[in-house]
Amino acid sequence: MQYRQLLKITMTFVVTLTLFLIPSYNHKTNATTPVPKFTRHAYEGNSLLLYPQVSGINIKAASKINSTLKGAAEKSYDNYIKLKKSEKDIPRKKLCKKTNNKCRYSYNSHYEVKYNSNGKLSIIYYDYAYTGGSKGKGSATMYNFDLMTGKHYKIHDILKTSCNYKKVQKYAFDYLSKHEPFSKSVSKLGDVTVNKNTQFSFAKDGIYLVYQENEFQSYTDGYPFIKIPKSVYK
């Protein structure tokens, strides 16, 4: 009887100790894959100049990311100030009577989270300026980060050799030249630019190449995102 009680106590201790020593899977997952929280801000209180800030991750990483994102907003603000100064130089008495739209300049910026998974973050930042006429001029800038370290990635961090650039360019060309509406303006390899200035976004199992509006003349539906599987450049 005493032997059975002793055996039961021993087994209970072993099970308890085992459960204590084995780490929680969920805890490990959360520790290795940060999940950021986003807050929206208006630069200098201007509701037309929006930018994000992140929290809920490593403080040093968040500080690096937030500094870069706020820097993007500062550039937009500088462009906004330049545009408003240009607006003041308009010969209003002559020009505004004929075409009132040409006297109403505007500038705005906003952002969108394109990828937030596996410890990587991609945010696209849009700028739009209107200086009269039928439409304004827009641009898009990608910001890619490591959520653990705050590292700001450029495409040369992904495509590390000239061979990788050529492989990606060839893959993008093969796709674009065979799919409308891109195929109408992509007929040779040189029509597809892939270099150290090319923008990208992280994606599941690869990246997206990101181009500006009208960079491919036959594509008029915003900013082209071209998927490149990781197998192409790894």
Where are these regions (language model features)?
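Compositionally biased intrinsically disordered regions enriched in Thr/Gly
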Residues: 2-7, 25-234
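Bacterial N-terminal signal peptides
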Residues: 12-21
